[in-house]
Amino acid sequence: MTEKYILAIDEGTTSTRSIIFNHDGQKVADAQREFPQYFPEPGWVEHNANEIWNAVLSTIANAFIKSGIQPNQIAGIGITNQRETTVIWDKATGLPIYNAVVWQSRQTNDIAEKLKTDGYEDLIHKKTGLIVDAYFSATKIRWILDQVPGAQERAEKGELLFGTIDTWITWKLTGGATHVTDYTNASRTMIFNIHDLDWDDDILKLLNIPRAMLPDVRPNSEVYGETASYHFYGSSVPISGMAGDQQAALFGQLALQPGMVKNTYGTGSFIVMNTGEKPTMSENNLLTTIGYSINGKVNYALEGSVFVAGSAIQWLRDSMQLVEKSSDSEAAAKASTSLNEVYVVPAFTGLGAPYWDAEARGSILGITRGTNRQDIIKATLQSLAYQTRDVVQTMQKDTGIDIKMLRVDGGAANNNYLMQFQADILNSAIEKAANLETTAMGAAFLAGLAVGFWQDTDELAQIFSVGQRFEPNMPEEEREDLYAGWQQAIEATKIFKHRPYKMNE
């Protein structure tokens, strides 16, 4: 019998990857292709959706070429993606009517601010679990419909379709046959009612978004459609798994029990907690979202987004030139002889959860004449751990659950100094996945379950393994003293609002 595999498409903010996994969950081949971001005006971030589609096709082809695997050996396809990014396209031609507006983009900020001033924050939070922000898809849809002449009327007639990137890729792969999204991606649009599991008519009416342009919303593990044979080298293969990137990482880490938490240390940090089958509405500025839905059940999650994590290490390397390679930061931190009196608050683009202070800017505090390069590097690494504690502590406050263990992935999870300090400052064990490809793995798991490639989550548990475990060993008095210093550093950073004179002219 011909051996079968699962293909995961991992569509990120700067590149697309296609990864082929075998039945043991091992990566057989992968291919990556970067695509450009466009910045038409300050604060605007856009993609060309067709460049993303081309990157999907080319990486699929290259993964097949590298592995020697045939398209008809793929049992199912899982898609994971950058969330919130918004595409609107012509149903008849498949051509986007405007560039994709990216999650990072602030060009729709005025629409979000008007929703706030008009008093809709509470309504939107209760229905969607989200705060009102330009980050999410709703304001982006409204902006494109306003920007492109005739778009509103065409959307009302059903001539235009909206999708987040998962929807766009699926629609293209199926040759326009399937217009669908999943619960996790829908829960990031700010127009999806996470209690009713449907688009919310009140919010659609508020923003004048026609329901006719919206995709069907489905669970994360089922057959949504099949590839058009002309897009998949003569083969019709089921697209059978779909999840936003952070939720895919939660599933890839098999954080399937309420109270389990994962942190992905990427450019930023995304801390996601499984809260079980009932949504926990945060009273402390965390996002309530959908974690995943399989076997007819929906698991909800709390999420805290930290804007700067791995990018702080890039800052040490590229801007400050304190390290030659990012990996050098571990040895430098270990070489520091400071008493941890230096604090770096990397608020380069403001502070994320739980502070949500867009005006804050970075700071270095506690320096003396004796402060050296290693001390600054160490304090920068420690800032990632402190910010994680900020979010984890807030999750504990919202849920009443004592978090004893954190599962981690992402590039900075390879830094053993950081992982040990993270365990110490949280007073929780840290488990690093043996396979750090947890986002793609999550998409593969969801796809494989739907087509019987894997039977159930018990079988997945046989595949998943912890690579390294870090136990806390810091005395409580020291831990709390260090964290009190961090809280002071945050307050000092929030106070400083001065801007250069020229910016205020």
From Swiss-Prot:
One of its GO terms (cellular component) is cytosol. It catalyses: glycerol + ATP = sn-glycerol 3-phosphate + ADP + H(+). Activated by phosphorylation and inhibited by fructose 1,6-bisphosphate (FBP). This is Glycerol kinase. Homotetramer and homodimer (in equilibrium). Keywords: ATP-binding, Glycerol metabolism, Kinase, Nucleotide-binding, Phosphoprotein, Transferase. ATP binds at residues 13-15, 267, 310, 314, 411. The keyword Phosphoprotein applies. NCBIfam families: glycerol_kin, PRK00047.1. Its EC number is 2.7.1.30. It comes from Latilactobacillus sakei subsp. sakei (strain 23K). Glycerol binds at residues 83-84, 135, 245-246. Pfam families: FGGY_C, FGGY_N. GO terms for biological process: glycerol catabolic process; glycerol metabolic process; glycerol-3-phosphate metabolic process. Key enzyme in the regulation of glycerol uptake and metabolism. Catalyzes the phosphorylation of glycerol to yield sn-glycerol 3-phosphate. Belongs to the FGGY kinase family. PANTHER family: GLYCEROL KINASE, SUGAR KINASE. The modification Phosphohistidine is found at residue 231. Sn-glycerol 3-phosphate binds at residues 13, 83-84, 135, 245. Pathway: Polyol metabolism; glycerol degradation via glycerol kinase pathway; sn-glycerol 3-phosphate from glycerol: step 1/1. The phosphoenolpyruvate-dependent sugar phosphotransferase system (PTS), including enzyme I, and histidine-containing protein (HPr) are required for the phosphorylation, which leads to the activation of the enzyme. ADP binds at residues 13, 17, 267, 310, 411, 415. One of its GO terms (molecular function) is ATP binding. The keyword ATP-binding applies. The lineage of its organism: Bacteria, Bacillati, Bacillota, Bacilli, Lactobacillales.
